[in-house]
C-alpha cells in the first residue's frame, strides 16, 4: 500500500480545507494510506476512515516563516511530515506551507540525492497543445551553470512523467541568440547543448513558454518565478476581462452562452487547482508543494500528484539520470 503524509497546518486555508481534501482523497483511493500530521485540535469531532492515520504533533509553521527558523522547529507539522519520508514510514509528503520552509525541510530533513547541487521546484505550465515543465520556478535564486544543467536533466524526467516523449529543452534568456545573457547563461547554454545535443533547442524567451516551443524550460529560480507569476497574472486577466465584457450587453451574453463549452475548457486549462501541486525534485523522496491558497479540490489533486509520482518511480528515475550525467562529466559516481 502506498503511504503519503500530509501537513494539515500548511496553507492559507489550513486546517479545514486541507483535511477536507485529504478525506475526499482517502475515500476515492483505498489503496493509499494517508498520515494526517496535525495538532490535537485538528482532529476534534473528526471521524477518520480506515486508510487514514492520525499523527499528532505540538507545533506548526506560519506562512511567513524563514527557512532557517523552520528547521529549528522540529516538532512542527511540516518538519515531522518530512521526517516520515526520511525514516521510510511514508513514500511521499504533501504540504501547502511556506515554499522556502518546505524546500529547507526537503533538502535537510528528507535529504538531497547524491551528486545533486540544488533541488529544484519543477512546475507544469499550460501550453497551447499540452504542458511544458519550468525548472526552477522559485526555489533557487542564484545558481551555477552546472546547476542549470541538472535542472534540465531533472526537468526532462518530470516531463517524461507527464507523458511527454523525447522532451525538447530550452534555456530561458533575454534573446534567442547563443551569446545572449550573462556569463552564467552562456556557460549553461554550452553545457545543455553538449548534453542534450539535438534535443536542446537553444535559448527561449518568455513569450515562447506557453506556445510550447520546448517541453522543458530551464531557468534559475529568480527568473523562473517571475515568468511563472507573470503567466498566472495574464491568465487571471484574460478570465476577468472575459467576465466583465460578457455582462456588458445582451449580445455578449448570448455569445457567451453559445461558447459556454469553449469557456469551460479554457477555465479548466487555466485552473491551477487541477494541477494540485508540483515536485521538489532532487531529494530522496516524493515531496509535493501545493499552492499556498489551496482549497480542498487543490489538495485532492496534490495528493493525486504524489500518488502518481510514487507509482512512476519518479525519484529513482531522476537519481539514475543524474548519476549518468555525473559519470559522463567526471567519470565517477
Swiss-Prot record:
Gene3D superfamilies registered for this protein in UniProt: Isopropylmalate Dehydrogenase (3.40.718.10)
Coiled-coil regions listed: none
Compartments where found: Cytoplasm
Any one biological process term the GO annotation gives: fatty acid biosynthetic process
Pathway info: Lipid metabolism; phospholipid metabolism
Reaction(s) catalysed by this chain's protein: a fatty acyl-[ACP] + phosphate = an acyl phosphate + holo-[ACP]
Xref: SUPFAM superfamilies: Isocitrate/Isopropylmalate dehydrogenase-like
Enzyme Commission number: 2.3.1.274
GO terms under cellular component: cytoplasm
Tree of life domain: Bacteria
Main location: cytoplasm
An example molecular function term from Gene Ontology annotations: phosphate:acyl-[acyl carrier protein] acyltransferase activity
Keywords: Cytoplasm, Lipid biosynthesis, Lipid metabolism, Phospholipid biosynthesis, Phospholipid metabolism, Transferase
Top-level EC class: transferase
InterPro entries per the UniProt record, alphabetical: FA_synthesis, Phospholipid_synth_PlsX-like
Role summary: Catalyzes the reversible formation of acyl-phosphate (acyl-PO(4)) from acyl-[acyl-carrier-protein] (acyl-ACP). This enzyme utilizes acyl-ACP as fatty acyl donor, but not acyl-CoA.
Subunit annotation: Homodimer. Probably interacts with PlsY.
Family: Belongs to the PlsX family.
Name of the protein this chain belongs to: Phosphate acyltransferase
Organism, scientific name: Thermosipho melanesiensis (strain DSM 12029 / CIP 104789 / BI429)
Taxonomic classification: Bacteria, Thermotogati, Thermotogota, Thermotogae, Thermotogales
Amino acid at each position: 500500500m502506498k503511504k503519503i503524509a500530509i501537513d494539515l497546518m500548511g496553507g492559507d486555508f489550513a486546517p479545514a480545507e486541507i483535511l477536507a481534501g485529504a478525506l475526499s482523497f482517502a475515500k476515492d483511493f483505498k489503496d493509499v494510506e494517508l498520515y494526517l500530521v496535525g495538532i490535537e485540535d485538528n482532529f476534534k469531532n473528526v471521524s477518520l476512515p480506515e486508510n487514514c492515520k492520525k499523527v499528532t504533533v505540538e507545533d506548526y509553521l506560519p506562512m511567513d516563516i524563514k527557512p532557517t527558523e523552520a528547521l529549528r522547529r522540529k516538532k512542527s507539522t511540516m518538519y515531522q511530515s518530512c521526517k516520515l519520508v526520511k525514516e521510510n514510514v511514508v513514500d511521499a509528503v504533501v504540504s501547502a506551507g511556506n515554499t522556502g520552509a518546505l524546500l529547507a525541510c526537503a533538502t535537510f530533513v528528507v535529504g538531497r540525492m547524491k551528486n545533486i547541487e540544488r533541488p529544484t521546484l519543477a512546475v507544469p505550465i499550460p501550453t497551447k497543445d499540452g504542458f511544458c515543465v519550468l525548472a526552477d520556478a522559485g526555489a533557487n535564486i542564484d545558481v551555477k551553470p552546472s546547476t542549470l544543467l541538472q535542472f534540465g536533466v531533472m526537468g526532462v524526467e518530470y516531463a517524461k512523467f507527464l507523458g511527454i516523449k523525447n522532451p525538447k529543452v530550452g534555456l530561458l534568456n533575454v534573446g534567442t541568440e547563443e551569446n545572449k545573457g550573462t556569463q552564467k547563461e552562456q556557460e549553461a547554454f554550452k553545457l545543455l547543448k553538449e548534453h542534450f545535443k539535438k534535443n536542446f533547442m537553444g535559448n527561449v524567451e518568455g513569450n515562447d513558454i506557453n506556445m510550447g516551443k520546448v517541453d522543458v524550460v530551464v531557468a534559475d529560480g529568480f527568473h523562473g518565478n517571475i515568468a511563472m507569476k507573470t503567466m498566472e497574472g495574464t491568465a487571471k486577466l484574460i478570465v476577468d476581462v472575459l467576465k466583465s465584457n460578457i455582462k456588458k450587453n445582451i449580445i455578449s451574453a448570448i455569445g457567451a452562452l453559445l461558447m459556454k463549452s469553449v469557456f469551460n475548457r479554457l477555465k479548466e486549462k487555466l485552473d491551477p487547482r487541477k494541477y494540485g501541486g508540483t515536485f521538489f525534485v532532487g531529494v530522496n523522496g516524493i515531496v509535493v508543494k501545493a499552492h499556498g491558497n489551496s482549497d480542498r479540490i487543490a489538495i485532492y489533486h496534490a495528493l493525486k500528484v504524489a500518488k502518481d509520482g510514487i507509482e512512476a518511480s519518479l525519484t529513482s528515475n531522476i537519481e539514475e539520470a543524474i548519476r549518468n550525467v555525473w559519470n559522463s562529466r567526471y567519470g565517477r559516481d
